Amino acid sequence: MYALDFLFIAFVYFAACHIQEKPVRAQEVQLPPGQECQMTPVIHILKHRGCKPKAIPSFACIGKCTSYVQVSGSKIWQMERTCNCCQEAGEREATVVLYCPDAKNEERRFRKVSTKAPLECMCRPCGSIEESAIIPQEVAGYAEEGPLYNHFRKSF
């Protein structure tokens, strides 16, 4: 009887050691076509108090990314979590002029406002992007192409 208990305990111990040596990876789940994270053209309505709203072409990051929770391969009493979100990988800045008819001063009838658009989109760990990741469009090579050409500033 004790020999069977010993063999069972030894089997469980060696199985646990074997599991801990092999890293366990999450199963890749393919999203249906068209649902992956991608940069999508949108119309952005810029608003400022006292000014007329202005519609401009822009981009947004839209789509789904894989997230999961599973038992840890190295610590079977713990769970591993991975959360990915469809986010921008860098940003572009633009300055747009809005017409403000209610301004008392003639000089303030046209107000410059800044806006941002993603440079590209990708699945990244959920959280906010660092301000240092913003790349001026001249560096990114977008200064002379695309629907945003007239909206983005040409020099700093």
Swiss-Prot record:
Keywords: Disulfide bond, Hormone, Secreted, Signal. The keyword Oxidoreductase does not apply. Residues 1-26 form the signal peptide. GO terms for molecular function: BMP binding; hormone activity. The gene is burs. GO terms for biological process: animal organ morphogenesis; sequestering of BMP from receptor via BMP binding. Final heterodimeric neurohormone released at the end of the molting cycle, involved in the sclerotization (tanning) of the insect cuticle, melanization and wing spreading. It comes from Manduca sexta (Tobacco hawkmoth). Heterodimer of burs and pburs. PROSITE patterns: CTCK_2. GO terms for cellular component: extracellular space. Residues 37-127 form the CTCK domain. Pfam families: DAN (PF03045). This is Bursicon. Gene3D superfamilies: Cystine-knot cytokines. It is found in: Secreted. The keyword Disulfide bond applies. Disulfide bonds join C37-C86, C51-C100, C61-C121, C65-C123, C83-C126.
